[in-house]
Amino acid sequence: ILRQTLRQLRNPAHPLRMAIDRDFSHRVEILDKEDGLVGRGLNASSVEGQLTLFVLSYDSFKNKDGRRAYAENSSLVALTNYQKAQGEAVEVAGADDTALITALAGMHPIVVVDESHHAKSSLSLEMLRNLNPRFVLELTATPSVKSNIISRVSAQELKAEEMVKLPVIVYRRDG
């Protein structure tokens, strides 16, 4: 789902991307974890006044690359210095001033979280808070009872879009 979400959001011909581009005057940047770690698309001139969508899974920040998100990042020095000068910098506990998590927090990104049902740990929730998002869209096959569900997609629709890796067997229980 993560790869397909990225592919669709990055495709200028996809209806969702077309709507986002229309609503934000084509000033939209779609980023994933790897883009952020190398600073791709993250500089003062490109982020000024644009909508930034950062697509990740909670697992993105739990491995070695996750720790790198809190470390000094020379690729982001210009952006974080710009954020400080503009009064947009956000301090993130345990993170370097030039870290990816700090740069993203200062941008107040819209965050699309794949497999959000894994976000039960305090560490996962802290990571999400550290991103300082303006909006979070959670994607999950198993929403909690308290979830604010805005859309449902059937298993057949997911299979038709090749978003399910395993065969899906759906049946109705009578009685």
Where are these regions (language model features)?
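Short, surface-exposed basic-aromatic patches at helix termini and helix-loop junctions that form
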Residues: 10, 126-134, 154-160
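Short, solvent-exposed coil/turn elements at secondary-structure transition points
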Residues: 34-36, 142, 174
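Residues at the C-termini of beta-strands that transition into short coil/loop
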Residues: 59, 140, 172
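Conserved helicase ATPase motor motifs in RecA-like P-loop NTPase domains
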Residues: 115-119, 130-147, 162
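Conserved interdomain linker/interface between the two RecA-like ATPase lobes of SF2 helicase motors
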Residues: 149-175
